[in-house]
């Protein structure tokens, strides 16, 4: 799979670098985005990714967040943030108004994942999605013992989890194909959140989470 991410005119792609100011999965996301890109970060929380991309890589970023406290924190850090419901209000963004849309550890918490992905593919030719993997071996073991899965990637108990659409990597990749996406790159993480590499037969068993670089139909890199 190709890791190239075309951006706006004059944008430069970077080699992977260390991002000490970002959590591990967001550092991987940042390395997939070319300098100078127009970036929309859905579920941006305190705006950490947008702030990093703007200050260090010349990107133009906008965050979307529904938590009012997180919105205030992001604005206080100098990030452009819009308070919107990802499930219901993405139609407010124009077609191809961004180069890339990021949805980091949020898809499983949306009410209508298919509609959210459809809106993302309308807004930008490339999407980056990160998700926890419900198929991790320790999750399966907990289920066999009659307990709901928990891990560093899924730290919530059954009664307070925001996750309502849990999926394994196999489930997710089938779903992405059905939605018309091409997976250009997949980065795997182990149960502790470190970047890892396994052959396909083991990825769904050993991965705690994954980041996907997606191209909408007709926009995949040859």
Model regions: which residues?
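Short conserved loop adjoining the S-adenosyl-L-methionine
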Residues: 89-95
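S-adenosyl-L-methionine-dependent methyltransferase catalytic module, highlighting the catalytic core
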Residues: 114-119, 126-220
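A short SAM/SAH-binding and catalytic strip from SAM-dependent methyltransferases
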Residues: 100-111
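Class I SAM-dependent methyltransferase "Motif I" SAM/SAH-binding loop
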Residues: 43-45
């Amino acid at each position: 799979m190709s890791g190239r991410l075309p951006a706006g005119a004059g944008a430069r792609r970077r080699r992977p670098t260390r991002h000490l100011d970002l959590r591990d999965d967001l550092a991987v996301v940042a390395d997939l985005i070319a300098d100078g890109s127009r970036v929309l970060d859905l579920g941006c929380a305190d705006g950490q990714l947008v702030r990093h991309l703007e200050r260090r890589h010349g990107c133009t970023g906008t965050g979307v967040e529904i938590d009012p406290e997180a919105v205030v924190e992001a604005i206080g850090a100098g990030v452009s943030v819009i308070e919107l419901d990802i499930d219901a209000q993405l139609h407010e963004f124009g077609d191809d108004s961004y180069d890339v849309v990021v949805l980091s550890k949020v898809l499983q918490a949306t009410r209508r994942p298919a509609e959210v992905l459809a809106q993302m593919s309308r807004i930008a030719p490339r999407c980056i999605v990160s998700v926890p993997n419900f198929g991790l071996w320790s999750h399966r073991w907990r289920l066999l013992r009659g307990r709901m899965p928990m891990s560093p990637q899924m730290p919530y108990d059954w009664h307070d989890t925001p996750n309502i659409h849990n999926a394994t990597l196999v489930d997710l990749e089938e779903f992405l194909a059905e939605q018309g996406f091409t997976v250009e790159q997949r980065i795997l993480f182990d149960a502790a959140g470190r970047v890892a590499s396994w052959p396909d037969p083991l990825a769904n068993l050993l991965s705690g989470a994954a980041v996907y670089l997606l191209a909408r139909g007709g926009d995949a890199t040859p």
